[in-house]
């Protein structure tokens, strides 16, 4: 029972976090030579690409929470 509540809460927080994250872009100076992108820049680019799927991810999390309540609720 407690594990169900913990898992339900985790998925709820996950759904909220996915729907509300904002990414800060690093300021680029036009006079500075371009260098290799850092790991942080690559992660930021990946999260920017994943941002298009955030509504689907949030709905998926809510669907999984519903299934947990239906199939594993007492």
From Swiss-Prot:
Annotated keywords: Membrane, Transmembrane, Transmembrane helix
Chief place of localization: membrane
Membrane topology qualifier: Single-pass membrane protein
Signal peptide boundaries: none
GO terms under cellular component: membrane
Residues spanning the membrane: 53-73
Location of the protein in the cell: Membrane
Database matches in InterPro entries: SMIM7
Family statement: Belongs to the SMIM7 family.
Protein name: Protein SMIM7 homolog
């Amino acid at each position: 029972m407690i594990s169900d509540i913990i898992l339900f809460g985790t998925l709820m927080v996950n759904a909220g976090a996915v729907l509300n994250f904002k990414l800060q872009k690093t300021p680029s100076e036009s006079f500075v030579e371009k260098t290799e992108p850092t790991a942080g820049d690559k992660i930021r680019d990946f999260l920017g690409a994943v941002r298009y799927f955030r509504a689907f991810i949030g709905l998926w999390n809510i669907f999984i929470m519903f299934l947990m309540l239906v199939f594993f609720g007492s």
